[in-house]
Amino acid sequence: MSHDISFGAVCRCVCTLLCWFAMTIVHAQPGTWQYYLAYGEPQQIEKAEQGLFVKASGNLYHYNLNDQSVTTFDRSNGLNGGQLSHIKWCSEAHRLIAIYTNANIDLITAEGEVTNMPDLYMATMAGSKKVHRIVTDGSIAYLCVGSSIVKIDVANAHVVETYTLGSDVWNVMAVDGNLYANTAASGVMVGRMSDNLINPANWHSTSHFPESIYDAYRGDYDAYISIVSQIDAGGPHYNEFNRLWFVNGCLYGVGGGWYDGGQMNRTAQWQQMDHEGHWQRIDTPMKKDAVSMAIDPADATHLYIATCGNGLFEFRNGQPVAQYTAGNSLLASAIPGNNDYVRVDGLFYDRQHRLWMTNSETQHPLIRMNSEGTMESLDHPSLFYNGTPLTILRNPTTDHTGKVWLVNSHNHHPCLVRIDPETDEVDCFDALRNQDETPLRDIYSFNCVAEDKDGNMWAGTNQGPLMLTPQQQQSPDYGYTQIVVPRNDGSGYGDYLLEGISVTAMAIDGGNRKWIGTESNGVYVISSDNTTEVAHYTSADSGLLSDRIESIAIDGQTGRVYIGTEEGLCAVVSDATDAAEKMEKGGVRAYPNPVAPDYTGPITIEGLSYDADVRIVNTAGMLVARGRSTGGTYIWDGCDSKGRRVASGVYHVLTATSDGHRGTVCRIAIIR
């Protein structure tokens, strides 16, 4: 393959790119973490010099009283944790003490400079590390931590000493050289601050103490709540994202409740973030637990919300227009006569634009509704086990043939269920054994399902991921595949992929990689051939907010992976986008472009076809770098094949499809 490139063309390209330099759109680079945190519910307010620090919905922002500017804080600008439990301004040290629910501590100046103080988080302590209160005395702060008092020097950011009192400490006060502690079991105790208070013998009960030791701490809340209540710090309204969908360029989420019995009675609202990052929160008449959503494929302003208790709600243009429940529809209550238990756990549209819903724990577990609002039930035998309906049918996904897959998340009969809306056939894949006929033991819940680009169906269970190959999908009797990952240690042995790890969410990116969210182990990214761990994100070593993952959704255009966690919503920019069906002139693009002299990061090339061959050559036609796209994206490090940074000039990106057909050419200008 040869290309004649004239000197004049190169000059014109360089000049054009230099003119574009000031207008280059800033793209988030792969590996960048972003946060979408709620600030809608003020919980604590601390006056700090010329501004207010506000803990709201468990997160932190600063409001400048002079210019009314708002600065939100998260991991991207220095914080070292997720949800906050307490904040307290230390006026003498000029720092805010911010304590997270995991007992990590950040000290923050009024200018936003953050110093991490992980001593308490890393300390080994008997009993709980739950912080009940922060009390300051000059530049010293006393933390009521479980049954202990932790004394810290705020100005110098270190722990001075710890006093253990034997029962929960609710409050402390330093008065006239004495330290008073309000404890759960021993009432008020006191010790002379000049004594060695590490020794429990130097503490004793007292009936003489400041009465205010019983007062609840309100800080500056009452003085400034009238101001704070008018502040819009942006972001979503709540931090609960039990399910996520990325549809038509918008992110949708419902808060819902977990089905493991741990977090029911959560928010009944649903939220939407548009392509510009603006959030819309929809207040609804629902009482609790919005758990699923279906957007009308013919009208994006028309959608339905399923609830775990109040039936089905219909919305148009963000306004509720109808409720379907027991008494006015085929929906029934799991507890006859009690309309607070009308459970709709899953929703989906078929290709005929009919709405399907699951009605858990009733004799009509699957119902569909046409565009006129007429409902009919589909009481297929596969929806029942020993005469009892499958209990929790949820999290539907549609495969490339139009068939719909759901999970049954109850130990009564855990399985995958497949529905063919064209024929009304239902199959229950309940043969819990693997490809070697080995029984799959201790599985009590199927939690999520996703289809990869090879037509395999992936199921996340409480014991790890399982897969149904296209051949296994031909019959429910064929069992499942447990992926074996070679150890590559010369033994010839392998291990089952993520065996024993509870999988709660799954999504497939443009490169056919599996993003697997877990109950307590963060997020794994598995290669397209299923044998390599591409990445493992945890809250300890990445920007992930929490290791407890509830949902994952991917924007295939940008490669942004949205992750709903126990502590809120975050996203990481991946190096995979959806592949272009056909590479066309102008469709392949690179950024940053041009590449500035001080830039040393990755150069992203997008708009490629799946598994495209990518070659980067200089103006002389010499090969500089070569690789294959991940989905529609190829990442170039700006170096040649020997790892050396390339010189200034224009570099041509030559692409070809996976079957060898030539694609398009784009150019990258590099300025050293």
Where are these regions (language model features)?
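Surface-exposed loops/turns
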Residues: 81, 610, 647-648
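C-terminal tail/sorting-segment detector
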Residues: 652-672
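Glycine-centered coil/turn sites that cap beta-strands in beta-rich domains
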Residues: 582-615, 633-636
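Bacterial Sec-dependent N-terminal signal peptides
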Residues: 1-33, 356, 405
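Short, glycine-anchored, charge-dense loop/turn motifs used at functional sites
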Residues: 614-624, 651
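Glycine-centered tight-turn motifs at strand-turn-strand junctions
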Residues: 623-646, 657-661
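Carboxylate-rich, polar loop motifs that coordinate divalent cations or form catalytic acidic clusters
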Residues: 25-588, 623, 654
